Amino acid sequence: MSKKETLKEFFANEVLNSLVDPGEIMSTQNGKDLASKIKTNVQKVLVGKEEVTILLLTALLADGHVLLEDVPGTGKTKLAKALAKSLNAGFSRIQFTPDLLPGDITGINVYDRQKNEFTLRKGPVFTNILLADELNRATPRTQSGLLECMEERQVTIDGVSYTPGEPFFVIATENPIESAGVFPLPEAQLDRFLMKLSMKLPTREEELRILELYMEEDPLHTLTPV
């Protein structure tokens, strides 16, 4: 079996098996057809981002994570939400700020007076697709809260390890032109990302298509899984 065929089989049987109806997978010829369906579905929400969508799916296939670096208004958040909806996957978003704590990401144990015991209050990382919005606005200490779950696919809270989600895919965003109130990503954090992508500003023709697409309502609201 060639590497390409192996990749198709992995896509169909491993990555999407827990997210998409198995009947849908069996009805497609292979994982490539399913990937094409996902890409087409995402294009109902985003205009002119076909290459980025393909690379995002490639990173998901490879069990990696993606850093989207671009100015505001290029569709970074919309892309993450559209992908999650297309896969019928769990989705969480963290808006990173300087006062965010690691426990706000992973979760904490909270004392329950009625039960007289500590119970886990899960953080946003307990999902399938996690959008780490403006990751570089958090301190390196807070950013480190993602290191373990991105690399080892587990979260350790008070000495107990938990599985965040299967699959677990992080899409982080950052604004490259900001200089005030931002922190450079540590090398250990950058090493967790398989790809660093740029969304790029839309062309004039794409702007007109976006205007037509969003004239009545946000198509993301009516987007359905593949």
Spans of model-derived segments:
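Pre-Walker A (pre-P-loop) alpha-helix and adjacent loop at the N terminus of AAA/AAA+ ATPase modules
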Residues: 30-74
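Walker A/P-loop
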Residues: 60-97
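Conserved ASCE P-loop NTPase core motifs with emphasis on AAA+ ATPases
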Residues: 3-42
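AAA+/P-loop NTPase substrate/partner-engagement loops
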Residues: 86-114
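Canonical AAA+ ATPase core
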Residues: 112-117, 138, 142, 150-226
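Conserved alpha-helical scaffold flanking the Walker A/P-loop in AAA+ ATPase domains
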Residues: 55-58, 111-131
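Conserved beta-strand position immediately N-terminal to the Walker
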Residues: 66, 130, 168
